[in-house]
Amino acid sequence: MNHIQEAFLNTLKVERNFSEHTLKSYQDDLIQFNQFLEQEHLQLNTFEYRDARNYLSYLYSNHLKRTSVSRKISTLRTFYEYWMTLDENIINPFVQLVHPKKEKYLPQFFYEEEMEALFKTVEEDTSKSLRDRVILELLYATGIRVSELVNIKKQDIDFYANGVTVFGKGSKERFVPFGAYCRQSIENYLEHFKPIQSCNHDFLIVNMKGEAITERGVRYVLNDIVKRTAGVSEIHPHKLRHTFATHLLNQGADLRTVQSLLGHVNLSTTGKYTHVSNQQLRKVYLNAHPRAKKENET
């Protein structure tokens, strides 16, 4: 990558507080774009709209999903927007490109029984289980992103208000409450997990060496929990975030409150969870309405 692209990625990291996972996706998108430029003997600063259309066709020829193509085009559009702020001679060849529609999907989530099974797995009386449980509790109790979790400092925990201050996308600060189970797991972790007691930094979640845990480290912990949990086959941090939102809506929380807790800028982003909770609404309706079923139906 050239220095402009490296500066762009650094801006996303420092000023917009992008997670390492998101930054890696942006970096991969730029690398693939550079390979196309080299293959077609094109230059970054003279890339035109017709070239952008050819690149779109190139992406589809690689049998990528529409979601992936959409993200890659969005990455390049954002990159050129950044470059235009530095050089007035640069044009954005992707600004008029028709954005491929994303495939609609329903967020995956865990049922309450599955969450109980996951928590049972980390009930073991070991040092590692103390740390693993606090990761699971915080992600489920607050719905925070994994990038927010790994950046929590000890001083961000408020035991008087029972909540945590996190810094989300764009370094936006928000306070998220947590319940009694989560509070207890944090207290037990701080009191009995030896690596956290001997470290020379303020990060709350650490690995077994006392170093601040990484996003990759959190994913490793969650995958390890799943391997030891019967009846649960797949987990990722965002699935716990989806579960947090879905369970709140299923229990009657309003969409605006969930939006605030998740740190979503647009209500439409939170709205995707209503499609999931509608399943619960239908279940309640079928069980409660006197004429929802015929007599011979079960």
Swiss-Prot record:
Annotated signal sequence is none
Quick one: a GO cellular component term? cytoplasm
**Record-annotated Core-binding (CB) domain positions:** 1-84
Gene Ontology biological process terms, A to Z? cell division; chromosome segregation; DNA transposition
What SUPFAM superfamilies would the database entry show?
DNA breaking-rejoining enzymes (SSF56349)
Q: What does this protein do?
A: Site-specific tyrosine recombinase, which acts by catalyzing the cutting and rejoining of the recombining DNA molecules. The XerC-XerD complex is essential to convert dimers of the bacterial chromosome into monomers to permit their segregation at cell division. It also contributes to the segregational stability of plasmids.
Q: NCBIfam families attached here? A: PRK00283.1, recomb_XerA_Arch, recomb_XerC
Q: Which family does it belong to?
A: Belongs to the 'phage' integrase family. XerC subfamily.
Put simply, this protein is called Tyrosine recombinase XerC
Record organism: Staphylococcus aureus (strain bovine RF122 / ET3-1)
- Designated gene of the protein: xerC
